[in-house]
């Protein structure tokens, strides 16, 4: 983890390291401390710092921290050193963190041949991160001459020479693998941005050629014709048997950075390289986008003592998640005891300015990625808009070109090669593979062994993986396609869909009828990758339809809720209006007094009716109120009602009681029920009515 303070959030640090693998950890830690572990702020700052470290402009000399003194820009470390007999052992350990090794070159291999003048090389490139190499050696591990030494801020190499006497003693051990990039391939969303080469096969027994990888430029002349850079005897890399793998890896942010390939000198090898086992190296070759209209020009020089100097910007060399890459894997040949591989004799270096005079050995595995094959002018004009990959190289021999197992990536499908232009964009979509095995024929006592090209598509995003194996049959292995992998030709698009980039098709460069291959045959060549991708797209399409149905249901619910809300708002508005109208209709004070008097009168009537009902219930069922015309007239009758005469004693007692009543006072009659009460009572004995009401 980071050697930062205790204030660093390690979860945020892990997320930032995953998102920006090219930025050193100390820079991420410092950014987190400055922004108080704010993820958004750190992402905004690191997105700007990421560009600097991608293109080698970041400051990697952390002299203040001894714990990270070995930390260097992992973009500048290339895995080419396979043996322990290396010049630079500290660089190998310093760059082991990214799974690669330092780009070195053995002293015993000899220096590169300086066949070109210093003033006629590539154009000036921006400064890059300094490569940490020993003093006196350049980035390729070769001793620099005292006349033209590299400056520290530039990542370049110096092409020195030892003289003509050393040239005659050196042995050309070459089996070049050439990667040609067209400068007018437009960049797009699916354009590959780096080239991943796992390794090159070790030298074949009794073969005077070694193995190397060149990048050739395409020079666009003012007349509009495209030609390949002329091959000369300069920039020849030598290999000893113990370090057979060497890759030149230049790249520019402007035009397509290329390194001129050259034929070996006219010498035969009396040495036999030691047989090497299966060795794998990982080299990421960045592919820069053509932003400038002037590609680098390369000229020849007759002097073998002339030195050359070039600066290279090695960028985007990462072992993290790789996207937008072209991955090429070269496997060593499986030796057969019954077959004896021989070289086809010495070859002379081409000093003319024509590509037609160049002839390469037939058993050299060559990989081309270009807008037009490096063949004759007729062949170039016929297949100019094609981006093709060839497993064998015979750039000057059209007859041998037919017998090569080649793979073409065509930028425009369905049209004739003569009518195509160079404006087609390279889209790393699903490639349809069309492989033609070579026609085996013997030339004298030599038997040509052609490597096989296996094109696969791994699970990295927008990756085109090419495996070159000399003795294996061609096959296409299925790869896991990322869910964000964009396809343009497997499913039917809607009518309003506009295709922005063309699909690459792998066809044969030498056969004219390949352009008229039916779409069914192309789809059959897609193998499991296309089938898996199509199944994935069908699954995604079904999922999209299901989500659309759910969206429609949710939209209907939303409309229903909106209608209910509108109705409730209307009801509320009506109630408010009604309330305001009722407030305006308040009665006046006179009307309220009249209503109060009416209510009082009604209450009196109710009380009278209630009392009549009570009186009816007290008189019994024989009481007939209708027979009494004036009921209230009899209320004021004074005098007792004489009882019925029963016997004598009742007659005698009656006057006595009356006397006593006279003594106490007269009885008072109730005004409500006409009951005669005792004079001492203040309320009626029957109805509880007050005496003086």
Swiss-Prot record:
Placement of covalent cross-link Glycyl lysine isopeptide (Lys-Gly) (interchain with G-Cter in ubiquitin): 611
Compositional bias per record (Polar residues), positions renumbered to this chain: 97-130, 232-282
Major place of residence: membrane
Consequence when changing residue 569 to K: Found in an patient with a form of frontometaphyseal dysplasia; uncertain significance
Positions of post-translational Asymmetric dimethylarginine modification: 173
Compartment list: Membrane; Endosome membrane; Lysosome membrane; Cytoplasm, Cytosol
Resulting phenotype, residue 670 to S: Disrupted zinc-finger; abolished methylation at C-673
GO cellular component, one term: cytoplasm
Descriptive protein name: TGF-beta-activated kinase 1 and MAP3K7-binding protein 2
């Amino acid at each position: 983890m980071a050697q930062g303070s205790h204030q660093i959030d390690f979860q945020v640090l892990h997320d930032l390291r995953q998102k920006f693998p090219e930025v050193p950890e100390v820079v991420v830690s410092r950014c987190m401390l400055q922004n108080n572990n704010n993820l958004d702020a750190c992402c905004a700052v690191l997105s700007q710092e990421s560009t600097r470290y991608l293109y080698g402009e970041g400051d990697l000399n952390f002299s203040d921290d001894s714990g990270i003194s070995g930390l260097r820009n992992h973009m500048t470390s290339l895995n080419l050193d396979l043996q322990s007999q290396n010049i630079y052992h500290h660089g190998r350990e310093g760059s082991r963190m990214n799974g690669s090794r330092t780009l070195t070159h053995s002293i015993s291999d000899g220096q590169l041949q300086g066949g070109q003048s210093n003033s006629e090389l590539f154009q000036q490139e921006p400064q890059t991160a300094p490569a940490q190499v020993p003093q006196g050696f350049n980035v390729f591990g070769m001793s620099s001459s005292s006349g033209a030494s590299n400056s520290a801020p530039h990542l370049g190499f110096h092409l020195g020479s030892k003289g003509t006497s050393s040239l005659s003693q050196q042995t050309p051990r070459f089996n070049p693998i050439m990667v040609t990039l067209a400068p007018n391939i437009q960049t797009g969303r699916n354009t590959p941005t780096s080239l991943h080469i796992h390794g090159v096969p070790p030298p074949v027994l009794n073969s005077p050629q070694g193995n190397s990888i060149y990048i050739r430029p395409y020079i666009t002349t003012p007349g509009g014709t495209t030609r390949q850079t002329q091959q000369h005897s300069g920039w020849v890399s030598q290999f000893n048997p113990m370090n057979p793998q060497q890759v030149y890896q230049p790249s520019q942010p402007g035009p397509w950075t290329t390194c001129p390939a050259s034929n070996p000198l006219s010498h035969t090898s009396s040495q036999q390289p030691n047989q090497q086992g299966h060795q794998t190296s990982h080299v990421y070759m960045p592919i820069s986008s053509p932003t400038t209209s002037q590609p680098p020009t390369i000229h020849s020089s007759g002097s073998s003592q002339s030195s050359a100097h070039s600066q290279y910007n090695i960028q985007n060399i990462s072992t993290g998640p790789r996207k937008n890459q072209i991955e090429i894997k070269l496997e060593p040949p499986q030796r057969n005891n019954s077959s004896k591989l021989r070289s086809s004799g010495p070859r002379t270096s081409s000093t003319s300015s024509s590509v037609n005079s160049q002839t390469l050995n037939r058993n050299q595995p060559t990989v081309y990625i270009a807008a037009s094959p490096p063949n004759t002018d007729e062949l170039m004009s016929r297949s100019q808009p094609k981006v093709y990959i060839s497993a064998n190289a015979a750039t000057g021999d059209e007859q041998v070109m037919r017998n090569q197992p080649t793979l073409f990536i065509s930028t425009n499908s369905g049209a004739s090669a003569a009518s195509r232009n160079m404006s087609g964009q390279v889209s790393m979509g699903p490639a349809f593979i069309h492989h033609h095995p070579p026609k085996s024929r013997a030339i004298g006592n030599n038997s040509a062994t052609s490597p096989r090209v296996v094109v696969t598509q791994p699970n990295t995003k927008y990756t085109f993986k090419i495996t070159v194996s000399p003795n294996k049959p061609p096959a296409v292995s299925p790869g896991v396609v990322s869910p964000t992998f964009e396809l343009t030709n497997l499913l039917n698009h809607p009518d309003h869909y506009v295709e922005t980039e063309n699909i690459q098709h792998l066809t044969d460069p030498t056969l004219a009828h390949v352009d008229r291959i039916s779409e069914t045959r192309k789809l059959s060549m897609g193998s499991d990758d296309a089938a898996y991708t199509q199944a994935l797209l069908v699954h995604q399409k079904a999922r999209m339809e299901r989500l659309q149905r759910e969206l429609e249901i949710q939209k209907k619910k939303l409309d229903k809720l909106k209608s209910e809300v509108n109705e409730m708002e209307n009801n509320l508005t009506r109630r408010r209006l009604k309330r305001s109208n009722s407030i305006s209709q308040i009665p006046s004070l006179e009307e309220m007094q009249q209503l109060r008097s009416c209510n009082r009168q009604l209450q009196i009537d109710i009380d009278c009716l209630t009392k009549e009902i009570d009186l009816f219930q007290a008189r019994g069922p024989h009481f007939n109120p209708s027979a009494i015309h004036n009921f209230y007239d009899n209320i004021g009758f004074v005098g007792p009602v004489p009882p019925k005469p029963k016997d004598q004693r009742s007659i005698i007692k009656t006057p006595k009681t009356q006397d006593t009543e006279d003594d106490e006072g007269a009885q008072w009659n109730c005004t409500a029920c006409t009951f005669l009460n005792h004079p001492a009572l203040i309320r009626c004995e029957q109805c509880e009515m007050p005496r003086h009401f």
